[in-house]
Amino acid sequence: MHPGFNAKKFPDKPAIVMAGSGKIMTHGELNALSNQGAQLFRSLGLKPGDSIAIMLENHFLFFPIIFAAWRSGLQYTAISWRLQPSEVEYIVKDCEAKAFITSKFLEDTAQNLNASLSNVSKFMLDGPSEGYESYEDAIREMSQDPIEDECQGGSMLYSSGTTGRPKGVKRQLTLNPLPYQEDDEDTGLGRALLIYGATEESIYLSPAPLYHSAPLNFVTGFLAQGCTAIILEKFDTEVALKAIQDYKVTHSQWVPTMFVRFLKIDPSIRTQYDLSTHQVAIHAAAPCPVAVKEQRIEWWGPILHEYYAGTEFNGMKIINSEEW
């Protein structure tokens, strides 16, 4: 669904909740901020089919920027903030980004890129930095109305580079005009989640770094569906369990290493949390050891859903707990 429609239907409903700080962004605010971001991109001369790159921690403004690019018809590349400056530089240049957005948290890396990205519009969140314009100041002057030529963009993510340099997974953008009404054709961001029973009432927990393929695409999809996304700034087993309990989480996404860490929790601590609202726990990214998955199903029940796809998304297989 279009963020503008969600903003009209339930403007005051939480769209994003940061589990650590408790900061909340409503669907109305998400729509307004992403409109301002889209206006900024057009003011920079970015047109449908152009690219931007973002390198951010799990930041409060991560998804307003993503939706700004999406509704502008741009291709957006999320970059791991754990990479070395030379690796970040390679990806920014390889994806042909015309704008690069990062944060004060990553200022050291950002400053190492200053000279090499001289032809790229550079923005910094959370404060000024030499060579970088304040993103918040830049959008503050922009209209909260939609741009006139809204069309559908999409992500261009990179492989891990295990056989050389990271390789961009570039899909042809449809650049379809975006729908505004409930009965218009769904653009696909939220549609894929219907297989997991997602509705606008779902509460989704995202515990992983947002630059990864699954967190990026799942959170975007749940937000497009009109859901609420609970985002962990950093993964912690007890913080995750508390978030499921406190926010009445219905859906979540994990990787096997998180499962292993969960199993190290003392059994007496496990039973302290009410996880009864948790309906679907999705996992992927790597093979899950059989013994680990058996113990996870024993603890959480048959709510685990595994899929095989990867960043390339060249085929997708899904299996639930009963089939497994």
Question: Model-derived features: where do they sit?
Answer:
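Conserved AMP-binding/adenylation subdomain of ANL enzymes
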Residues: 177-207, 211-251, 265
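Conserved AMP-binding/adenylate-forming core of the ANL superfamily
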Residues: 15-59, 63, 84-89
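A short N-terminal helical cap/helix-turn-helix that marks the beginning
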Residues: 1-16, 32, 154
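ANL superfamily adenylate-forming
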Residues: 108-157, 165, 171-189, 266
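A short helix-loop-beta submotif of the ANL/AMP-binding
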Residues: 51, 57-85, 93-99, 113, ...
